């Protein structure tokens, strides 16, 4: 994840340089960031994307956002097609469609003069020189907008042929799936861009059925995120409360073998080894891996889900 994040930031830095804008990196938590902003830019407006985070980040970001919202100094952009307030099941599909069909902002063309005072922050180059990746994972995905658009176009034009069937295969999914999940998660391409490009591609496609299947997955992507947005307690509690006490504390030795892909079950172990090597595995196999840990190995999901 850190590697992909650095890939994305590197491309952002390069693109901003072309517009005469340097990318600076702040290091610290949200409280420290708020204090730094108020000292250096007390009248500034904050622009950020909404994200559905785990509890640790959600708590801190909510305090940060509330501070600036009270002063009407924050603009939050919708990242995915989810309801962030006024939750209404009946209106969900309508709201999703409304968000996904909004016009895509055009790229800023003009160079911006850099007239800010010395803000004493590291440039991206200075920041990245301090980052050391212990496990390079050479076969993992490359982050950044350029790669995201390459994947999207190759999927819509060629790789998506047979997607409806191949996406379930641990052998074929690596190439037949869009492989855009990483880029959607890190923001190197927007869901709105993917959806609108998909709508443009469908009429002239020779594999419409596969693209319609992909269209459903874009809805499901937000459907599952909506669950965590609406019920953040699902991070800690089972959806069905009666299941919370079914398992004990877990067996660390069994969990360790599961993580390493050394359970002795060939299919499961092969998937775990693939995941460790590539940093990605298709949705059906992710579901299988977690189901195996919960049902076959009878381990608590609270311990296996973060791993």
What are these regions (language model features)?
Residues 176-307:
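Active-site-proximal binding-pocket segments
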Residues 1-214, 225:
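Active-site "lid/cap" and pocket-lining segments within catalytic core domains
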């Amino acid at each position: 994840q850190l590697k992909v994040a650095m890939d994305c930031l590197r491309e952002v830095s390069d693109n901003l340089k072309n517009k005469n804008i340097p990318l600076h990196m702040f290091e610290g938590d949200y409280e420290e960031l708020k204090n730094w902003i108020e000292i250096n830019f007390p009248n500034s407006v904050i622009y950020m994307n909404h994200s559905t985070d785990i509890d640790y980040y959600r708590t801190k970001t909510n305090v940060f956002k509330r501070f600036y919202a009270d002063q009407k100094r924050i603009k939050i952009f919708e990242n995915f097609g989810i309801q962030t307030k006024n939750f209404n099941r009946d209106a969900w599909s309508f709201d999703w469609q409304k968000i996904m069909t909004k016009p895509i902002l055009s790229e800023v063309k003009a160079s911006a003069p850099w007239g800010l005072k010395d803000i004493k922050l590291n440039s991206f180059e200075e920041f990245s020189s301090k980052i050391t990746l212990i496990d390079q994972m050479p076969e993992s995905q490359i982050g950044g907008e350029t790669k995201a658009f390459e994947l999207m176009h190759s999927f819509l034009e060629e790789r998506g042929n047979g997607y409806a069937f191949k996406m379930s295969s641990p052998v074929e999914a690596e190439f037949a799936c869009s492989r855009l999940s990483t880029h959607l998660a890190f923001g190197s391409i927007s869901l709105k861009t993917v959806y609108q490009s998909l709508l443009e591609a469908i009429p002239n496609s020779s594999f419409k059925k596969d693209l319609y299947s992909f269209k459903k997955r874009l809805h499901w992507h937000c459907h599952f995120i909506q669950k965590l947005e609406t019920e953040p307690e699902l991070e800690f509690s089972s959806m069905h409360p009666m299941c919370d006490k079914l398992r004990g504390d877990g067996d660390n030795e069994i969990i360790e073998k599961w993580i390493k892909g050394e359970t002795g079950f060939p299919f499961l172990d092969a998937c775990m080894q693939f995941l460790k090597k590539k940093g990605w595995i298709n949705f059906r196999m992710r579901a299988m891996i977690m189901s195996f840990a919960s049902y076959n190995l009878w381990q608590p999901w609270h311990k296996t889900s973060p791993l």
